[in-house]
From Swiss-Prot:
Cellular component GO terms held in the UniProt record: chloroplast thylakoid membrane; plasma membrane
Alphabetically ordered keywords of this record: Chloroplast, Cytochrome c-type biogenesis, Membrane, Plastid, Thylakoid, Transmembrane, Transmembrane helix
Family in the record: Belongs to the CcmF/CycK/Ccl1/NrfE/CcsA family.
Its biological purpose: Required during biogenesis of c-type cytochromes (cytochrome c6 and cytochrome f) at the step of heme attachment.
Organism ancestry: Eukaryota, Viridiplantae, Streptophyta, Embryophyta, Tracheophyta
NCBIfam families per record: cytochr_II_ccsB
Subunit text: May interact with Ccs1.
UniProt name for this protein: Cytochrome c biogenesis protein CcsA
InterPro entries: Cyt_c_assembly, Cyt_c_biogenesis_CcsA, Cyt_c_biogenesis_CcsA/CcmC
Membrane topology: Multi-pass membrane protein
Residues spanning the membrane: 9-29, 45-62, 71-91, 98-118, 143-163, 227-247, 261-275, 285-305
């Protein structure tokens, strides 16, 4: 009873803090960039991280298994993963260029997890025999860390496409400034002077706005590539460990289960992204389109099976819980 109450308190505290963080971030964009607001936002995300960590540890203690057995627990772990991705850039250079992506993603996943749709999953249950394995922590945690990284990288690619096509189509409006201000990357440090001269040739000498926009798109492309590469690595480890676990549990490494099929499709999409990103003929827009497609595929892979409750991976799904 004590652990359940503590988990309930930590859930509401973390959700309240991250809501305040998003409000601060919006005020920072609408009013002006102030150090005080930025610091408050970062401290809020750290507090959210510790609250969700405490929540997961508490659930782990009283359930006696790693909290990744149903949709509710996986959503909370996904929100925890977003908070980690949020803090990494800040600790590296004290500038968070991902706050416009990670904070809304964290509140969306946690909000859905704590909604009335998943109320019955809030109470921990005994693991089914197939999930009583040491591979549970390895496989599911790697997949969810991969999903979080791939989603963040894909959203950066979506932002790149929005900025690029608004410029190409010549769409006016203040939203350009709002979108550009959402990603405080600052000045790009070019690896060599040749790269810098290439950037200057592609923008007008007298157009600082175009130069800054081009800098932003290049930085978005670079950050998207790095985060997606990390997520692709996590997903690969997760799929391989899942195959070993499947062989132990079901006697086969691969069964073309709906979850496995969509995981393979997701992996293939981002493998194509990495290939096009390293190809000189496809730059910026081409890989960004592929990554944007991957954003939708990830949600189909993650929510599709869990919401429909079909296949071998339907443990703790929404459909089974509702029934």
């Amino acid at each position: 009873m004590i652990f359940s109450t503590l988990e309930h308190i930590l859930t509401h505290i973390s959700f309240s803090i991250i809501s305040i963080v998003i409000t601060i971030h919006l005020l920072n964009l609408l009013v002006h960039d102030t150090v005080g607001l930025c610091d408050s936002s970062e401290k809020g995300m750290m507090a959210t991280f510790f609250c969700i960590t405490g929540l997961l540890v508490t659930r782990w203690i009283y359930s006696r298994h790693f909290p990744l057995s149903d949709l509710y627990e996986s959503l909370m772990f996904l929100s925890w993963s977003f908070s980690i991705i949020h803090m990494v850039p800040y600790f590296r250079n004290h500038k968070n260029s991902l706050s416009a992506i990670t904070a809304p993603s964290a509140i969306f996943t946690q909000g859905f997890a704590t909604s009335g749709l998943l109320t019955e999953m809030h109470q921990s249950a005994i693991l089914v025999p197939a999930l009583q394995s040491q591979w549970l922590m390895m496989h599911v945690s790697m997949m969810l860390l991969g999903y979080a990284s791939l989603l963040c990288g894909s959203l950066l690619s979506v932002a790149l496409l929005v900025i690029t096509f608004r410029k190409t189509l010549g769409i006016p409006g203040k939203n350009n400034h709002f979108l550009i201000g959402s990603f405080p990357f600052g000045e790009i440090r070019y690896f060599n002077e040749k790269r810098k001269r290439s950037v200057l040739k592609k923008t007008s000498f007298f157009s600082f706005r175009n130069y800054h926009r081009y800098q932003l798109t290049q930085r978005l492309d670079h950050c998207s590539y790095r985060i997606i590469s990390l997520g692709f690595t996590f997903s690969t480890i997760g799929i391989l460990s899942g195959a070993v676990w499947a062989n132990e549990a079901w006697g086969s490494y691969w069964n073309w289960d709906p979850k496995e099929t969509w995981a393979f499709i997701t992996w293939t999409i981002f493998a194509i992204y990495l290939h096009t990103r390293t190809n000189q003929r496809f730059q910026d827009v081409g890989p960004a389109i592929v990554a944007s497609m991957g954003f939708l595929i990830i949600w189909i892979c993650y929510f599709g099976v869990n919401l429909l409750g079909i296949g071998l991976h339907s443990y703790g799904s929404f459909a089974l819980t509702s029934n």
